[in-house]
Amino acid sequence: MKKISNNIFFIMLISGTLITISSNSWLGAWMGLEINLLSFIPLMNEGKKNLMTSESSLKYFLTQAFASSILLFAIILMMMFFNENWMMNNNFNNLLILSTLLLKSGAAPFHFWFPGVMEGLNWINGLILMTWQKIAPLMLISYNLNINFFYFTILLSMIIGALGGLNQTSLRKLMAFSSINHIGWMLMAMMNNELLWLTYFLLYSILSMSIILMFNNFKLFHFNQIFNFSMMNPYIKFFMFLNLLSLGGLPPFLGFLPKWLVIQNLVEMNQLFLLFIAVCLTLITLYYYLRMSYSIYMLNYNKNSWMLMNSYSNNNLTLILTMNFISIMGLLIITLIYLIL
């Protein structure tokens, strides 16, 4: 019975997002966001109940409900003084709606809830929060651009995403700050080209899925568990290492492709200062990916070697290997196809 209810909530989750992105009015978009929110809360509480999960779901609900109420208030204001359409002439209303959507997506300076919520979720729900839950608000943001405010948000997202992950021992919080940094890149892509941010988001989702499925399969949540991970299969360690480099955006892996496209676009638009800051801050995020890789290869903590005994399964091994192959070899395959055609 519980599995059936979870499937229903999952279908509602997908439906809410589709309603939002296909709506031709702000009120319809708001309704889709609410369906999405109310269907994700039960999914957050599935499985083993603990205080961290309950706290995360409550934080998520309060933050999203607050954002939804402000969004509804802004929509009502707009309907009172203007026509109910996508283009707005009122700067205050524009900024109010943009702020609520940034709060829903977890971008800086409205990111405060995101790492704390991620910490209390299992990896699969964390993956949904990092990817699917961002589609609807980011799509609405792309309809409602405010370039001056965008520069501030992009720079702050990249700074917080880079510096926030430096002193983290929790892998979930580290992935949360990584996600905040990637949101900065997506907003930067969105500023110049709508198709470009969708491409970036799709590739980011593939990379996140690849690494999170490995974390989930091997029950890795903290850095000290990675020390024990060093005792495992060397091929698995190698795949984990390459996945982290790919997520960091190093060539010749798939993670380099979205950054390459954004860099090319920024050079064409002559936004070199923004590009310089973005690349410098991304190097900091690459540092904490390399720190994880160093933990996998160099450190061995035998004292707790029993912790990982029988803690992983081979149930999703085919999916994990497929996602690893795409993440690691994707750019090379795309390049070969391009050269052949």
Swiss-Prot record:
Single biological process term from Gene Ontology: mitochondrial electron transport, NADH to ubiquinone
Catalytic activity: a ubiquinone + NADH + 5 H(+)(in) = a ubiquinol + NAD(+) + 4 H(+)(out)
Disulfide cysteine pairs (residue numbers): none
Bilayer topology term: Multi-pass membrane protein
Domain of life: Eukaryota
InterPro entries documented for this protein: Complex_I_Subunit_2 (IPR050175), NADH_DH_su2_C (IPR010933), NADH_UbQ_OxRdtase_chain2 (IPR003917), ND/Mrp_TM (IPR001750)
One Pfam family in the UniProt entry: NADH_dehy_S2_C
GO molecular function, one term: NADH dehydrogenase (ubiquinone) activity
TM regions (residue ranges): 8-28, 61-81, 95-117, 145-165, 195-215, 238-258, 266-286, 320-340
Keywords: Electron transport, Membrane, Mitochondrion, Mitochondrion inner membrane, NAD, Respiratory chain, Translocase, Transmembrane, Transmembrane helix, Transport, Ubiquinone
GO cellular component: mitochondrial inner membrane
EC number: 7.1.1.2
Annotated localization: Mitochondrion inner membrane
Main location class: mitochondrion
Cited function: Core subunit of the mitochondrial membrane respiratory chain NADH dehydrogenase (Complex I) that is believed to belong to the minimal assembly required for catalysis. Complex I functions in the transfer of electrons from NADH to the respiratory chain. The immediate electron acceptor for the enzyme is believed to be ubiquinone.
Family per record: Belongs to the complex I subunit 2 family.
Alphabetical list of PANTHER family matching this protein: NADH-UBIQUINONE OXIDOREDUCTASE CHAIN 2
Protein name: NADH-ubiquinone oxidoreductase chain 2
Gene that encodes the chain: mt:ND2
